A protein has these predicted regions:
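A short, conserved acidic/glycine-rich loop-to-beta-strand motif
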Residues: 124-134
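Short acidic-glycine loop/turn motifs at beta-strand connectors
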Residues: 145-151
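Conserved N-terminal catalytic core of the sugar/cofactor nucleotidyltransferase
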Residues: 2-5, 27, 31-105, 114-116, ...
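N-proximal low-complexity "stem/linker" segments adjacent to membrane-targeting elements
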Residues: 1-5, 10-16, 25
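Histidine-centered beta-alpha loop that forms part of the nucleotide-sugar donor binding/catalytic region
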Residues: 8, 54, 133-134
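Hydrophobic packing residues within well-ordered alpha-helices of enzyme cores
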Residues: 14, 60-64, 228
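Catalytic-core segments of class I nucleotidyltransferases/pyrophosphorylases
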Residues: 46, 100-102, 109, 115-122, ...
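Active-site metal-binding loops of divalent metal-dependent hydrolases
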Residues: 10, 107-108
Length: 246
């Protein structure tokens, strides 16, 4: 399976750090966040990665090159105008060759067995699988409603209309999708990938949720950036295992 890392964001809440460095290149434990995610992908057998670029985008290829230094192959998708999660993924669709793709955020660090996630996606014959977390403030992050059979039926209130017994989850920004879902999105326009998932649900596509309770950090604010450095120092992230390949 190929992967895509979303790395085009402006990182406005981390200014002034992001005035001169794109957020995915900010270091944690001395290594850029996006490199930790590349190493996690490699550890789970993924070697082909697409990275989208916008804000200070030239710096990311300068840092990562073509991926050969990591034993990987990196293709870049440049966005002259930022396209959001949906538009960015749709622009890169040509690189997926009609096959499912694993999507990660370049500014999120987590400990997840990606092999188990990919196995679940295949076993469920899903059009999309969203990694979900239990969170008392799920609605603040964007409420995802999932049945006891792990089927996602509504996202931010949109999706299936009939009343169903559901549990509240938040979307962790880690997902697998089949490119056919991208047909619902406009080309060359900023949009959210969640729009494609909502349309898929309404069209009867199988959109599944995968619960994940392990370490996860969206490094979006100075406070969370400082916290993830402390978490790494405390060993909550097994970064050394990624760097050695064990």
């Amino acid at each position: 399976m190929k992967a895509m890392i979303l790395a085009a964001g402006l990182g406005t809440r981390l200014r002034p750090l992001t005035d001169t460095t794109p957020k995915p290149l900010l270091p944690v434990a001395g290594t850029p966040m996006i490199v930790w995610n590349l190493l996690l992908l490699k550890r789970h057998g993924i070697r082909d990665v697409v990275i989208n670029l916008h804000h200070l985008g030239a710096m990311i290829p300068q840092a990562l090159g073509d991926g050969s230094a990591f034993g990987m192959r990196i293709i870049y998708s440049h966005e002259p105008v930022i396209l959001g999660t949906g538009g960015g993924i749709k622009q890169a669709e040509q690189h997926f060759h009609g096959e499912p793709v694993l999507i990660l955020n370049g500014d999120t660090l987590f400990e997840l067995d990606l092999g188990a996630l990919m196995d679940f996606h295949r076993e469920q014959q899903a059009a999309a699988t969203l990694v979900l977390r239990r969170d008392p403030e799920a609605a603040r992050w964007g409420l995802v409603e999932v049945t006891d059979h792990a089927e996602v039926v509504r996202i931010t209130g949109r999706g299936r209309a009939e009343p169903l017994a559901t549990a509240a989850r938040m979307f962790a920004g880690i997902h697998i999708l089949h490119p056919r879902l991208l047909r619902a999105l406009p080309a060359g326009k900023e949009c959210s990938i969640l729009d494609a998932y909502v349309q898929g649900i309404q069209d009867g596509e199988r959109v599944m949720g995968y619960d994940f309770d392990g370490f996860w950090s969206d490094v979006g604010t100075p406070e969370r950036y400082a916290q993830v450095e402390r978490d790494a120092a405390a060993g909550l992230l097994s970064l050394s295992a990624r760097s050695t390949g064990h």
